[in-house]
Amino acid sequence: MSASSSGGSPRFPSCGKNGVTSLTQKKVLRTPCGAPSVTVTKSHKRGMKGDTVNVRRSVRVKTKVPWMPPGKSSARHVGCNWENPPHCLEITPPSSEKLVSVMRLSDLSTEDDDSGHCKMNRYDKKIDSLMNAVGCLKSEVKMQKGERQMAKRFLEERKEELEEVAQELAETEHENTVLRHNIERIKEEKDYTMLQKKHLQQEKECLMSKLVEAEMDGAAAAKQVMALKDTIGKLKSEKQMTCSDINTLTRQKELLLQKLSTFEETNRTLRDLLREQHCKEDSERLMEQQGTLLKRLAEADSEKARLLLLLQDKDKEVEELLQEIQCEKAQAKTASELSKSMETMRGHLQAQLRCKEAENSRLCMQIKNLERSGNQHKAEVEAIMEQLKELKQKGERDKESLKKAIRAQKERAEKSEEYAEQLHVQLADKDLYVAEALSTLESWRSRYNQVVKDKGDLELEIIVLNDRVTDLVNQQQTLEEKMREDRDSLVERLHRQTAEYSAFKLENERLKASFAPMEDKLNQAHIEVQQLKASVKNYEGMIDNYKSQVMKTRLEADEVAAQLERCDKENKILKDEMNKEIEAARRQFQSQLADLQQLPDILKITEAKLAECQDQLQGYERKNIDLTAIISDLRSRVRDWQKGSHELARAGARLPR
C-alpha cells in the first residue's frame, strides 16, 4: 500500500496555540557529520509567575532508522541536540536496538506531595488552634475590660463612701472637740467654783468673826448708851447731881467713847479687809481669765495645727489616688495598644495564611495536572516506540522482498523514508513537549519548596506570636494582681476608716454618757453658787465691778470666738479647694474614660477591614474559579491532542508492510 492510499499525509498535533505551552523554535545545523541540529527556545507563558529553574535531562530514545539504498550515505549515528539557554534537552539515539528511557516513575512520585499535604494539614491545624487561642485571648481581654469597668465603678462607689465617711468623721470630730471644750470648761468652772467656794468660806469665816466682833462692840456700845440714857433719865427725874453721878457720867462717857473708838477701829479693819478681798478677787479673776484665754488660744493653735495635718494627710491621699488613677490609665492604654497590635497581627496573619493556602491549593492542582499530562505523554511515547518497533520489524521482514524488487520499490522506499523522517520530527516534538513538562514540573516543585520554606517562616512567626501572646498574658496577670492589691488596700483603708468611725462614735457616746453626771454636778454647783449669792447680798457693789470685768472678758472671748470662726472659714475654704481639685481629677478621669470608650469604634473599623479582606478573598476565589475553567479548557485541548495521537497511531498501523 502506498502513502497516498492511506488517506494522504498523516495529521500531527500542533504544540502551538492548542497545546499547553507555546513554543518558538529556531533550527540551527550543528551535527558532527554536517547534519542539521534543532535549537528550541521555550517560553512558558501559562500558569503562575514563579522562579524558573534550569533543568538538564538526557533522554536516550532508540529511533527507527530508515532503510537507505546503496550509493547513499547512511544516516546512522547522527546526533540531534536540542539546545536552550535555560534548559537543554539532548536526544542521542544509541547503537543498541533496544529502546531505553532514562525517565523513571520515581521522578513523578507523589510522596513529596503527600508529605507537603501532611505538613500543610498540620500547619492548618496549628493555625486553627492559634486562631482559637487568639479568640480566647480576645474574649478574656473583653472580660478583663468588663472587670476593670466594674472595678472602676466599685472604686468610684468606695470613693464616694470614703468622702461621706470623711465628712461624717469631720462632723463627729467637730462635735467631739465642742464636747471636749464644753467638758473642759465645765471641769474648769467646777474647779474654779470649788476653789472659790473654799476661798469664800474662809473669807466668810473671817468676815463673820469680824462681824461678830463688830456686833459685840455695837451691842456693848448700845448697852453703854442705854445705861447712859438711864443715868441721864434718872438725873432728869432727880434734877440733882451728886459727885458720884457726875463721876458715873464721866465714866460712862469714857466707856462709850472707848466702845465707839473700838467699833470704829473694827469697822475700819473690816472695810480694809473687804477692800483687800475685792482687790485679791479682781487680780485672781484677771489671772484666771488670762489663763483661760491663753489656754483657749493654745487649744485653737493646736486645733489649727491638727487641721493642717489633716489637710496635709488628705492632700497626700488625693495625690496617691491621682497617681493610682494615672497608673490605671497607663495600664489601660498599654492594654488597648497591645490588643490593637494583636488584632492587626492576627488580621495580617490571616490574610497571609489565606493567600498561601490559595496558592498552595492552586500549585497542588497544577502539579497534579502536570503529573497526569506527563503520564499521558509517557504512555503516548511508549505507544509510539512500540509502533516504531513494529515498523522496524516489518521493514526487516520486507527487506528481502525489497532487495528483489529494489528498483520497483525505490519510489515507495523514498516515500517511507520521508514518512520516517516526519515520524522522527514528530517524536522529537513529543520529546520536547515531555522535556517542557518536566521543566515545568521542576519549576512547580521549586515553587512548592519555596512555599514550604514560607510555611517554615510562618511557623517561626507563629512561635514568635505565641511568645508575645504569653508575654501579654503575663502582663495581663501582673496588671490583674496589681488591681487586686490596689482593691485590697482600698478595702483595708475603708475598714480602717470604718473602725475609726465606730471608735469615734463610741467615744462620742461615752462622752455624752459622762456629760449627764457632769451636768448634774453643774446644776448642784449652780445651786451652791445661788446659795452663796443669797448669803453674799452685801457684796453687790463688788459683783457689779466683777460684772464689768466679766463683760470685758466676754468681749475678749467674743474676739477669740471670731478668730476661731475665721479659722473655721479658712478650713472650709481649704476643704472647698480640696473638693474642687478632687472634682477636677474626677473630670479628668471621666474624660480619659470617655477616651477609653472609643475602643469599640476602633474595633468596628478593624471589623470593616476584615470584611474588606473577606471581599478580597471572595475575589481570589472567583479568580480561582476562572483558573479552573482555564484548566478544564486545557484538559479539553489535551484530549483533542490525544485523539490526534490516536489517529496518528492508526495511520502508522495502516502503513504498507
From Swiss-Prot:
Location of cross-link Glycyl lysine isopeptide (Lys-Gly) (interchain with G-Cter in SUMO2): K138
Keyword check for Phosphoprotein: yes
GO biological process: cell differentiation; regulation of cilium assembly; spermatogenesis
A GO CC annotation given for this chain: spindle pole
Record's subcellular location: Cytoplasm, Cytoskeleton, Microtubule organizing center, Centrosome; Cell projection, Cilium; Cytoplasm, Cytoskeleton, Microtubule organizing center, Centrosome, Centriole; Cytoplasm, Cytoskeleton, Spindle pole
Cited InterPro entries: Odf2-rel (IPR026099)
Primary localisation category: cytoplasm
Posttranslational modification: Tyrosine phosphorylated. Phosphorylated on Ser-95 by TSSK4.
Modified sites of kind Phosphothreonine: T92, T110, T231
Coiled coil segments of this chain: 144-423, 461-635
In-chain residues carrying the UniProt-annotated modification Phosphoserine: S73, S74, S95, S106, S109, S115, S129, S139, S261, S632
Keywords annotated in UniProt: Cell projection, Cilium, Coiled coil, Cytoplasm, Cytoskeleton, Developmental protein, Differentiation, Flagellum, Isopeptide bond, Microtubule, Phosphoprotein, Spermatogenesis, Ubl conjugation
Family named by the database record: Belongs to the ODF2 family.
Quaternary structure note: Self-associates. Associates with microtubules and forms a fibrillar structure partially linked to the microtubule network. Interacts via its C-terminus with PLK1. Interacts with ODF1. Interacts with MARK4; the interaction is required for localization of ODF2 to centrioles. Interacts with TSSK4. Interacts with AKNA. Interacts with CFAP58. Interacts with BBOF1. Interacts with CCDC38. Interacts with CCDC42.
Function recorded in the entry: Seems to be a major component of sperm tail outer dense fibers (ODF). ODFs are filamentous structures located on the outside of the axoneme in the midpiece and principal piece of the mammalian sperm tail and may help to maintain the passive elastic structures and elastic recoil of the sperm tail. May have a modulating influence on sperm motility. Functions as a general scaffold protein that is specifically localized at the distal/subdistal appendages of mother centrioles. Component of the centrosome matrix required for the localization of PLK1 and NIN to the centrosomes.
Protein name: Outer dense fiber protein 2
Lineage, top ranks: Eukaryota, Metazoa, Chordata, Craniata, Vertebrata
Gene that encodes it: ODF2
